[in-house]
């Protein structure tokens, strides 16, 4: 049978559609409904769900309805398939990038909704530590 969701990689492009590089977050080999605890590991444009499991976007979220939608789809899916292919060329600057703080707050709230406040707080402490180490090592490199 066909998978409920197929997903793949994302290439970043500039306004002239010139290749910049690959998205920092790589699509995991095995994607599951718990995967997005670590952030949006797959761009929604590189995430294709069967219509039968795909709900409407929750328009209460201005910047992160895609994040909520992907989690809802994964919660309904039985099979997810990694294509190991670049599925989209993604414009590096978009509405979410321009509204980063509001987008991050929405994503945090969505994560709490699906994964629980304690889990999300612990994960965000880990994200902060990882970010600081990356910054320190980048300076020293």
Predicted ranges, named:
Residues 112-141:
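Membrane-proximal basic amphipathic "stem/tether" segments
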Residues 8, 14, 21-102, 106:
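Conserved nucleotide-sugar donor-binding catalytic segment
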Residues 1-5:
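Conserved donor-nucleotide/metal-binding helix-loop-beta segment in metal-dependent transferases, i.e.
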